[in-house]
Every structure is written in structure tokens, then in C-alpha cells.
Amino acid sequence: MPAYHSILMESDTKLIGNMAMLPIRSQFKGPAPRETKDTDIIDEAIYYFKANVFFKNYEIKNEADRTLIYITLYISECLKKLQKCNSKGQGEKEMYTLGITNFPIPGEPGFPLNAMYVKPSNKQEDEVMRAYLQQLRQETGLRLCDKVFDPQTDKPSKWWICFVKKQFMNKSLSGPGQ
């Protein structure tokens, strides 16, 4: 079975580095264009997460795949935090904190995918990339809480938490041992 790739890349999609800055439906402020369709890159990443997380190798077919990879790795980080949460409210607080926590971007030490991502070419692009990734992180965390927590029990679903130990492409956005 092949890995799933993003189908959201358009010819006029803006790039930051070699990563697509795709539109998203978001309640958070940021540089991402507003999405008007039903599905955006975050929905796509969450939908394909359970299938893609098993792949150790992933062929990048377009710049949107780099955005998909980043969100997939971020979902793994979110699940590590959510497994320790006792309620959706606590999970949302954890996701907000994780979303705004300082994080490395391509080109900086500590970013695990520097071999596949181009660093921003100037200070302005650096700021736009950081803001876009933060917007993706915040919105992904919020939407993931809706998927992970069972509305009846207010506990994390074992069908999501079972993926905590899986590493997509043998990579992690957090350092070793975290």
C-alpha cells in the first residue's frame, strides 16, 4: 500500500522555503490564506495520519507533501501530550501550550528535517514561516482534540493513543527522550 500524498497543491500556491503555504480554516491569526473548501491540509493530515504514520520512507511529490509531513509529525507530538490528559478541556490547554511553545524551523539546529526542507531565504520569510507553522500547530491541536477525545467519556480514545509510539519516517519534532 503506498503512502498518501496531498492533493491540495495548486499552481498558484505560495511557497515559503520549499514548503507550501496552503489555505486553512482557522480561528487563529496568522499568514495562512483562508480556506473556503470543506477540506484543508490539516483535515487531510489528520485523515491520513493513521495510514501514513507506518511509513519509514516517504516520497515527496510536491511542496504540499512537506506541509503534510510537518503536520503528521506534529500530530505525533500532540498524541504524546494527549495520552496524559484526563479530559478534553485539559487536552485543549496542553495543545494550546504546545502550539505556542518555541520551536525550531527549517535551517535551525534542532529541526529534524533540515535535509528535506530549505531554510527561509531572508528575515521576512523566516517570520512568515514561523507564523504559518505556529498557526498550523494551534489549529491542528484544537482539531485533534475533537477527534481524540470520546464525547461520552471525555477520555482519550485508545484508537488514537495507540499511535503514540509510532514514528513517521523515524523522525520526531521533539528531541530524543522527550
From Swiss-Prot:
**Could you state a single Gene Ontology molecular function term?**
actin binding
Signal peptide, first to last residue: none
Q: What cellular component terms from Gene Ontology apply here?
A: Arp2/3 protein complex; cell projection; cytoplasm; nucleus; site of double-strand break
Principal localization?
cytoplasm
Q: What biological-process GO terms show up in the record?
A: Arp2/3 complex-mediated actin nucleation; regulation of actin filament polymerization
Keyword field = Actin-binding, Cell projection, Cytoplasm, Cytoskeleton, Nucleus
Keyword Cytoplasm listed: yes
| Compartmental location | Cytoplasm, Cytoskeleton; Cell projection; Nucleus
Assembly and partners? Answer: Component of the Arp2/3 complex composed of actr2/arp2, actr3/arp3, arpc1 (arpc1a or arpc1b), arpc2, arpc3, arpc4 and arpc5.
Q: Which family does it belong to?
A: Belongs to the ARPC3 family.
Put simply, this protein is called: Actin-related protein 2/3 complex subunit 3-B
Source organism per entry reads: Xenopus laevis
Q: What is the lineage of its organism?
A: Eukaryota, Metazoa, Chordata, Craniata, Vertebrata
By which gene is this protein encoded? Answer: arpc3-b
